[in-house]
Amino acid sequence: MMALGEPYYSSKPDKDFNFGSTMARRQMTPTMVTKLPKFVRNSPQAYDWIVRGLIFPTTGKTYFQRVVVITGGLEDGTYGSYAFNGSEWVEIYPIEHLNLMSSLKLIHKANALQERLRLSQEEKATLALDVQFLQHENVRLKELIPKPEPRKIQMKWIIVGAVLTFLSLIPGGYAQSQTNNTIFTDMIAACKYSTETLTENLDLRIKLALANITINDKLDAVRQILNFAFVPRAHWLRTVFYYIHYYEMWNIFMFVLAIGTVMRSARPGTDLITLATSHLSGFRMAVLPTIPFHTTMTLWVMNTLMVCYYFDNLLAITMAILAPILGIIFLCFMEDSNYVSQIRGLIATAVLIAGGHACLTLTGTTTSLFVVILTCRFIRMATVFIGTRFEIRDANGKVVATVPTRIKNVAFDFFQKLKQSGVRVGVNDFVVIKPGALCIIDTPEGKGTGFFSGNDIVTAAHVVGNNTFVSVCYEGLVYEAKVRYMPEKDIAFITCPGDLHPTARLKLSKNPDYSCVTVMAYVNEDLVVSTATAMVHGNTLSYAVRTQDGMSGAPVCDKYGRVLAVHQTNTGYTGGAVIIDPADFHPVKAPSQVELLKEEIERLKAQLNSAAENPVTVVTQQPIVTLEQKSVSDSDVVDLVRTAMEREMKVLRDEINGILAPFLQKKKGKTKHGRGRVRRNLRKGVKLLTEEEYRELLEKGLDRETFLDLIDRIIGERSGYPDYDDEDYYDEDDDGWGMVGDDVEFDYTEVINFDQAKPTPAPRTTKPKPCPEPKIEAQPLDLSQKKEKQPEHEQQVAKPTKPQKIEPQPYSQTYGKAPIWESYDFDWDEDDAKFILPAPHRLTKADEIVLGSKIVKLRTIIETAIKTQNYSALPEAVFELDKAAYEAGLEGFLQRVKSKNKAPKNYKGPQKTKGPKTTTH
């Protein structure tokens, strides 16, 4: 016997986890360690010590020799198992170790995060280097930018400005000639002014006393106010007005514009020339409101016409009137926007020249034209003020000013604010919040808020989406959690992980009060709290809360901190929530079809009993309606099925109880509820419906297979099947290797056929054949069994009642008759292809282990045949599968279909054979 060494561990995590068998680790040799597959570095592996015959086709004594099997995660991201055949590691079907798979998943996630961290650090370093390069480049480019030089004003424009200033200082028409005044003339003027003032005051007081004030008196009063008659004669304002009286308003305005143009204008030449031509032509103030309508070309046209007006006014008027007409004709080649701008400037020039000449001729000044143009501009601006404010942008589109369209009520603004604020009449209550009961739900689609309630984490259903597992972030740690249940409402219940222990949990409100609600949520990993008054709308709430992304799924609580609803709506201002009830936490288990049928049978029995007690004597002859004349609904078909089931239920109960008596006994160690148990002849001798009733059901639309499946389900429930099919149990990875574990009993006498050449067994001593017992029980499948010798008294009592079968092949036990090719050589169609193989979750463990590869091959052939509608290869494939099943001691699939759907009346099912036991767990 070889001496065993110390257990082998590939890394410290492997030693810490220590998955699998220690004995298998002791069997590791340096050669085996050298040839190990490329598992993930610093990851655990599971070691199993399994009988060689369960893995490799083996005969003789080597069948019971054990080999080392290593299971772990490979560097390419796959999960696999490898067995050592003496010279090298051979990949076999993966053995499931749940703890190992969970550990590998966490290690893979940690490695992925480390890789992401490494890439992020590299990217950060690269970006930091790029920032440094950009900073250096920025400094270099700043040095290349020419520094702005101080603005230089050309001397010619200074001269033009000085000329305009000189022109503006020339006295206007109000200048008076200087007279020689003496003391006597001043006294006479003062006495005259006093006498006139006294007379005017007396007349005004008399009119006021008699209430005889006319409109002319009111106009004279306004005129005196405008002439500053209320200012005393010795006041300093009189002195200022005395000197300003020598100059007109245009002179002062032109002086200010000339100084400002020389100092700040970007185009001083054009602006100064425009001021000069306005002054020389006499249009003066009337020119300024028309400047926004002009382009560069039309502005020079206006200046030219004003200079021409100074020399020949009639020629200037004629050219101004013809300018728009000529512009419409000769400028039509321009773009629409430029074309309209040019024509608008020419029209403004014509209006200015013609209107200015008319005003100068009639009134001697252009003030009236200035007022008219200014009024038109105000009207134009008022018509386009639609919104509450308008923005003024520069040439680059940047907003430089914002002007409100309505004047702010400055005088009464204080009273309005006082009215809106009101006077405090109460005190707000405190509300209870529990930040420790909140968490963040993270999914690939986004983030949301969740809260702990009971053993669940509650959030909004649209946060979870179609994900089965989500990430729960709580106090800086991330946990993986499974979505337990989602009702019809926008609510999702997530199972709280076992290693997550929240510091607080929220309870549901027994007496909901929606007058004041509190919303707690995480926004950008910051806790936000808001209170508002809610309104109830059926099963939803609405409240005025400024909602942000990430608040979905947050709890809506009352002032005591009890949950009322789950936040779900995000409109930016108005928040909404769906009310949560205690009934929402647990799914309503829908009654099974069998229970519904039983209830309906009891109801029909009660109706029959009541009908028997009160028989109806009057019978109305109804006309016979044929099937073509009658419209049959689904409810009529269901009622017919229920009536038939009521009549046959009593017979089914008695016979099923008699047949399934052995199966109803609970055996020690059986925890799978009879899953995979072989059941035969459960409907033997039972006549469910008459031929006429059966045909009537088919004509009314009921499928024969549906009806038989319903009966099979009832039988399966009574014989130990669960009420439902556990879809999670029959996953695509469950290929029979799930039984390999620490709590599984192995039968090392089992031989698995992998379609390899059968070896010739060693010579054996002939043993007496066991006689069949009077009562035969169905036993689990085993391909080989060491039969024990029965006592002599039992052999004498048991007498064979049937002829003995032919001796089976070595290490094999057949089932029924061998398949014949003539039984498979017929025209196959799509229905035959679909129903030849059962569903994957209805296959037994023996089918999956022995015939797994052939079943997968046949399914591929069936799918190809259905797609191409070519079923020529199907008979041979089914024949090969049934032949392999026969050699392995299993029932053929064609025989199963016949025994289920097409058995003759005298058909007694497949022949019973005793097989060795196998232990499944």
Curated annotation (Swiss-Prot):
Protein name per the record: Non-structural polyprotein 1A
GO biological process, one term: viral translational frameshifting
Skewed-composition ranges (Low complexity): 908-921
Similarity section: Belongs to the astroviridae polyprotein 1A family.
InterPro entries (alphabetical): Astro_1A (IPR045835), Astro_p19 (IPR045833), Astro_VPg (IPR045836), Mamastrovirus_p20 (IPR022068), Peptidase_S1_PA (IPR009003), Peptidase_S1_PA_chymotrypsin (IPR043504)
UniProt EC number: 3.4.21.-
Gene: ORF1
GO molecular function: 5'-3' RNA polymerase activity; serine-type endopeptidase activity; serine-type exopeptidase activity
O-(5'-phospho-RNA)-tyrosine sites (modified residues): Y694
Parts of the chain that traverse the membrane: 240-260, 287-307, 314-334, 345-365
Post-translational modification: Cleaved by the viral and host proteases. The protease is probably autocatalytically cleaved.
